[in-house]
Regions:
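Flexible "stalk/tail and boundary" regions
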Residues: 10, 14-74, 83-141
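Single conserved hydrophobic/aromatic residue that forms the stacking wall/gate
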Residues: 1-13
Length: 141
C-alpha cells in the first residue's frame, strides 16, 4: 500500500466515530466523535434556553438511532448497523459515500442521483451565491 493510504487506514482503525441519521433522516452520517458531541451540545443548549417539544422529539429520535463508540473493522471497513441502514436506506443496496462538511454522508444512490440532478439544475444560482459571498469577502479586506 502507498504510505498515505496505509496511514489513512491505520487512522480509521484507531479512531472512533458515531454512525447516526443525517439531520434530515434521509441518509446516514458518520461523524467524528467530537463533531457529534458538539452537535448534541448545540441542540441541548438551544433546548435549555427555551424548552421546545419538537426539538426534544427530534433529539430523542436522533439519539435513539445513533451508534456511538464505533470503529472500523480489522480491514478498515465501516459496518453500518442493520437497523439504521434499513430505516434510512430501505432495501437499497447501492449507496454513495460523500464528504459533507464535517462528516461523511451515506445515501441511496437512486436518491443521490435525484439530488445531483436538482443540484445541476440550480448550479447557476449556486454560482451567483458564491460570487456574492466572494464579493462580500473582498469588501472586508
Amino acid at each position: 500500500l502507498h504510505p498515505r493510504v496505509r496511514r489513512q487506514r491505520q487512522m480509521c482503525i484507531r479512531d472512533r466515530f458515531v454512525i447516526a441519521p443525517e439531520f434530515d433522516f434521509k441518509s446516514i452520517a458518520i461523524y467524528p466523535e467530537m463533531v457529534f458531541m458538539r452537535l448534541c451540545e448545540h441542540y441541548e443548549r438551544l433546548n435549555r434556553k427555551k424548552k421546545n417539544a419538537q426539538l426534544m422529539n427530534y433529539m430523542q429520535w436522533f439519539n435513539s438511532m445513533s451508534y456511538t463508540d464505533q470503529e472500523c473493522d480489522a480491514q478498515g471497513r465501516v459496518l453500518l448497523p442493520a437497523k439504521l441502514r434499513s430505516m434510512m436506506l430501505g432495501e437499497e443496496k447501492d449507496v454513495d459515500i460523500m464528504g459533507n462538511d464535517d462528516h461523511l454522508r451515506v445515501a441511496a444512490t437512486i436518491n443521490n442521483m435525484a439530488n445531483f440532478e436538482l443540484f445541476k439544475d440550480n448550479l447557476n444560482a449556486t454560482w451567483a451565491a458564491i460570487d456574492e459571498l466572494e464579493d462580500g469577502e473582498d469588501e472586508k479586506e
